[in-house]
Structures are given as structure tokens and as C-alpha cells.
Amino acid sequence: MWKLWGSWPEGDRVRIALIGHGPIAAHVAAHLPVGVQLTGALCRPGRDDAARAALGVSVAQALEGLPQRPDLLVDCAGHSGLRAHGLTALGAGVEVLTVSVGALADAVFCAELEDAARAGGTRLCLASGAIGALDALAAAAMGTGLQVTYTGRKPPQGWRGSRAEKVLDLKALTGPVTHFTGTARAAAQAYPKNANVAAAVALAGAGLDATRAELIADPGAAANIHEIAAEGAFGRFRFQIEGLPLPGNPRSSALTALSLLAALRQRGAAIRPSF
């Protein structure tokens, strides 16, 4: 069957390195599209053995320590990983693919990333992560009057280790409670491990400061639920996804890992979507 997504031409191969060695990185490494070769990984000091065991490749703490220069650096480690290696890679002309979209809520860091990419003649690519419909938002943003609200709903345990613990007793909840309302920029900055989706929605559509975000702890939620409500001159739409975790890893989004694999596959396609 003919597929829009295509694949890498036979004989062509792109070399990638990963930032991180957690569940998302391990899933990506285990399911690479044809034509994509994993040649190394970057990890924090002291994590070399764990990274080698998880990924089975050469490991370093800095890009220049890898035995082969990658064509693409894939960030699977979160904001800290992008901050540690993004600027260096982009400045050296290595393209970066990241799921840490919330890191761009820091306007200074975002500008530094853009400057580094321009200086290196490359680009920073943002994976869609745990959400969809970003293509529709991007199209709607070309019109007028766009208004967007993102709602993130998770079971209480999904908010552990976040700012929500400071305002809620997560173990005592008997019904849904909204613990954050504000801009997508503020959400991404206050919840760096939980609000990458809010930032992705905002950057695709109305922008970080014009997109409204609501974060909810809901003991009745069986999955992480992401919802986009948008309206403007184009019309209106509502999109919802109930995201499941990677098998055996309840805190890692399956769709986030799959979005990286999809981005890798699309890079090699002669015919592919424009989004």
C-alpha cells in the first residue's frame, strides 16, 4: 500500500545520537525506522554505565566526546538535556529534534537557540509529543481572531513532583480540581515536566502568551487527557486525546516516543506532509 510518509531511500542512512537514556530514549532506540542508525548518546556524569546498558551504544557527556558526529541529535531527556546540549549542537551545525518544547517558554533561552541555529546553518525541530491537531492550529493561526484553550487533565499521581503538590493534597482528592489557570508560557515555566503539551499547542497556534492553559488533577481520570479548544475566522474545533503510557513506564507518554519515531521516518520521505 502506498503511504504518504515514505521511508529512507535504500542505501541512505542518517546517523543520530540521543540525549538521555530513559524510557522514551530506549523506546526510540529499539524501534528506529529503516535507514536511521543510532551511533551514540549523551548522558549526565556518572550515568555512563546505565546509558550503555539501556541503549547499547557509545556514551559521552558532551557532543565532541562521541566517536562519530551525528547528523541529528534527538532530545529525549527533558528541559535539562536541551539546555545542556542544544546550543552546542546547533552552533556546530548539528540539527536537533526535541520533545522539550516547554523549554522555549524561556524567551532568553529561545532566542539563544535561534541564534545558535542560524549561526550553525541548521535548525531546531519540535516534535509534536503527546498531542495532535497542531497542523490545524498552525493553519488557523494564519487567519484572524484565533483563540485557543489547552486543558491538561491527569490522575493525581501524574502531578507528583510538580508544583501541584504545593497547592493540593493529591492523595485526598475526591473529584477534579483545577490547580493552574493562566497562559501557556506560565504553565510551561511552572510545570517543566508536565506542560510541554501546553507549549507545543501555543507555539503552533496563538502563541505562548495568548494561549490559555488549565491544568487539572482528576482522580476519575484513567489516562492523561489533553484537550484543545480553538476558534477564529477559520471556524472552530475541539480535539481530545487520552494518552497511554509506554508499557511498564507509567510516567512516560507512548505518543511522545512515537512522535519522535514519526519525525525520523518523515525526514527520509520524498513525499511527506508539510507539517
UniProtKB/Swiss-Prot annotation:
Listed Pfam families: Asp_DH_C (PF01958), NAD_binding_3 (PF03447)
One example of a Gene Ontology biological process annotation: NAD biosynthetic process
Domain of life: Bacteria
Presence of the UniProt keyword Manganese in the record: no
Keyword terms, alphabetized: NAD, NADP, Oxidoreductase, Pyridine nucleotide biosynthesis
EC number: 1.4.1.21
Classification via Gene3D superfamilies: Dihydrodipicolinate Reductase, domain 2, NAD(P)-binding Rossmann-like Domain
Catalysed transformations (reactions): L-aspartate + NADP(+) + H2O = oxaloacetate + NH4(+) + NADPH + H(+); L-aspartate + NAD(+) + H2O = oxaloacetate + NH4(+) + NADH + H(+)
EC main group: oxidoreductase
The keyword Zinc is annotated on this UniProt entry: no
GO MF annotations, alphabetized: aspartate dehydrogenase activity; NAD binding; NADP binding; oxidoreductase activity, acting on the CH-NH2 group of donors, NAD or NADP as acceptor
Active site: 226
Protein family (similarity comment): Belongs to the L-aspartate dehydrogenase family.
Task performed by this protein: Specifically catalyzes the NAD or NADP-dependent dehydrogenation of L-aspartate to iminoaspartate.
PANTHER family reported for this sequence: ASPARTATE DEHYDROGENASE DOMAIN-CONTAINING PROTEIN, L-ASPARTATE DEHYDROGENASE-RELATED
NCBIfam families noted in UniProt: PRK13303.1-2 (NF009827), PRK13303.1-3 (NF009828)
Further information: The iminoaspartate product is unstable in aqueous solution and can decompose to oxaloacetate and ammonia.
Protein name (Swiss-Prot/TrEMBL): L-aspartate dehydrogenase
Species: Ruegeria pomeroyi (strain ATCC 700808 / DSM 15171 / DSS-3)
Upper classification of the organism: Bacteria, Pseudomonadati, Pseudomonadota, Alphaproteobacteria, Rhodobacterales
